[in-house]
């Protein structure tokens, strides 16, 4: 069973579905609970989409032994980026007194108004809205759940990279 799951394109396609499924879940929660995503939330979604696109490219390419390792490295880099963003978001939520108390500018405004380097700096500093905890599942916040998902997808990518092709 596991061999078939990880064989060739199936494993990569599963990673693609999981990545974009998580983005879909985030959009569903946003609509259902009228949540306004902060810049770090949007950055995490972008990281999930990047990871998903890499999984889709690998599924379409169906790489050999060396290619699986290259894709594995790219997947791990994308997952590590997501882990870093989620970890920063968790820190901001745990230390709301260390960030701005008021809500800052939205993601779109920041990206349209500032040069890329300055925009990224502002996004990763976090804003007051990044410290808000609007929804939890089993006592875990959305960034904590995202961190778990990024770690899981990163480990899954490593497993795919070293799995023998059927």
Curated annotation (Swiss-Prot):
It comes from the Bacteria. GO terms for biological process: protein folding. One of its GO terms (molecular function) is protein-disulfide reductase activity. It is a multi-pass membrane protein. It is found in: Cell inner membrane. GO terms for cellular component: plasma membrane. Required for disulfide bond formation in some periplasmic proteins. Acts by oxidizing the DsbA protein. Belongs to the DsbB family. This is Disulfide bond formation protein B.
């Amino acid at each position: 069973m596991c061999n078939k799951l990880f064989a060739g394109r199936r494993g990569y396609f599963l990673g693609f579905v999981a990545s974009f499924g998580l983005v879909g879940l985030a959009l569903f929660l946003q609509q259902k609970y009228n949540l306004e995503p902060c810049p770090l939330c949007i950055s995490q979604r972008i990281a999930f989409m990047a990871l998903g696109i890499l999984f889709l490219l690998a599924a379409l390419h169906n790489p050999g032994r060396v290619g699986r390792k290259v894709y594995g490295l790219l997947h791990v880099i994308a997952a590590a980026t997501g882990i870093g963003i989620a970890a920063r978001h968790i820190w901001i939520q745990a230390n709301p007194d260390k960030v701005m108390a008021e809500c800052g500018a939205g993601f779109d405004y920041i990206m349209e108004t500032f040069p890329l380097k300055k925009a990224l700096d502002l996004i990763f500093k976090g804003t007051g809205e990044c410290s808000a905890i609007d929804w939890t599942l089993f006592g875990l916040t959305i960034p904590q759940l995202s961190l778990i998902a990024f770690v899981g997808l990163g480990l899954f990518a490593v497993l795919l990279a070293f799995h023998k092709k059927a």
